[in-house]
Amino acid sequence: MPLIEDELEQQDSQLESLQQALNVLMPIRRQRLSRAQRQQRQHQTRLAEAQAQQQAEEEQLVQDQQHYQLQRERLQQQQSSREKLTRHVNNALSALQAVGQQQQQCQQAEQSCHQAAYALEQATEWTREQQKAVEKLEYLSEHLEDA
């Protein structure tokens, strides 16, 4: 009988040690999960902002292209004085430069969207990993209490 009691005491001691370890690990894992979720939300916000910026840049590009087209048409229609022609050429060149700059801004906004999407993807993966770690500890903790 003493052997069985010793084994039970040893088993209880091991279970208690395991429970203590789980009690230490659980808050750490929950904190990591919370941090991962917060970071994921931040990246989602950044992605939404980058997408909105890209949309605004694309809309501005359309406006600049329309303005350039208008200036170009005016230039073609105007063939009066040299002064008017020079002014229209300068206006058309300015409009063309604005289109080029807007295209660059659209490309930068698109790149920002890609970067934000990648960061969100990484944050989401980290969140999943932290969630799995917490679930494993919860599972162990529940089964430890049943034992």
Protein language model features and the residues they cover:
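Charge-rich amphipathic alpha-helical interaction elements
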Residues: 1-147
